[in-house]
Amino acid sequence: MAGLKLQAVTKSWDGKTQVIKPLTLDVADGEFIVMVGPSGCGKSTLLRMVAGLERVTEGDIWINDQRVTEMEPKDRGIAMVFQNYALYPHMSVEENMAWGLKIRGMGKQQIAERVKEAARILELDGLLKRRPRELSGGQRQRVAMGRAIVRDPAVFLFDEPLSNLDAKLRVQMRLELQQLHRRLKTTSLYVTHDQVEAMTLAQRVMVMNGGVAEQIGTPVEVYEKPASLFVASFIGSPAMNLLTGRVNNEGTHFELDGGIVLPLNGGYRQYAGRKMTLGIRPEHIALSSQAEGGVPLVMDTLEILGADNLAHGRWGEQKLVVRLAHQERPTAGSTLWLHLAENQLHLFDGETGQRV
């Protein structure tokens, strides 16, 4: 068991432009951290730096209180699970799981014990003699994880391990990964572009954008209190509604570009007259009535999702999505009267994009 620390780590390919800006992260012993962000945000590069597969330009990496910044990958005490299973097709499941230990010179008895235990944990006991071609995608991924488990690493590194699986298998493997971490309690750093994976697996999430950690927090924190416009727009499906406008002179209302005026929950007078963005999640908008002071929205389209429905409309040029109950199915062109929960409104600075 070990902790992981990244201290002001940067990466530059040309010595000028930083693709990873100075980034500091403390991962507690046994903690499961997920790095999530769009393609090209730097999350896989950062993971490879921790693994020793990419050189750190500046800063330091520590594993178990030992500085490993220049250390060879094999000496860092890490095990990595990739997007591609990378199994040897001519070897059995048992041989694939044992191979890394064999080339390290571990004794046969110890190898057999470790493989047996990993197979038991991953429910691969009855598949040890099979070849990869005889396995399903989920079983192959479990073999790849078993190959990492037998090494008994200080830190697990996962690089989008579920992205090659179909939707149903991904759900199953997410649950298996949760159970695996609860059992092993090994420090883990996991990379994905899938926010559902991030929210369901992580104890803490690091949302990355353009080589910067926009926010580090629990899944609940990043969902309920996004630190920036990027986090607000990236986390959540559908994304948070983001509406541009200004706070009125009294700080009591938000005036949207397009004439709609929304009440604020007070305390915003210091932002009077400033260009701001107001955010609210679709589930925090309720159906109301004109008599109750509801705000009108002409619905353009309705998405029927089964458990609930999504109504789409516009206030001027600004799009709005409202999550409705399963039984609510208004027709296109009808007017919805809406109430926005004032205690669920988020304000972001119009220039910096940061939460205020």
UniProtKB/Swiss-Prot annotation:
Compartments, as annotated in UniProt: Cell inner membrane
EC number: 7.6.2.10
One of the record's GO cellular component terms: ATP-binding cassette (ABC) transporter complex, substrate-binding subunit-containing
Protein name per UniProt: sn-glycerol-3-phosphate import ATP-binding protein UgpC
Family in the record: Belongs to the ABC transporter superfamily. sn-glycerol-3-phosphate importer (TC 3.A.1.1.3) family.
Keywords: ATP-binding, Cell inner membrane, Cell membrane, Membrane, Nucleotide-binding, Sugar transport, Translocase, Transport
Organism whose genome encodes this protein: Shigella sonnei (strain Ss046)
Principal EC category: translocase
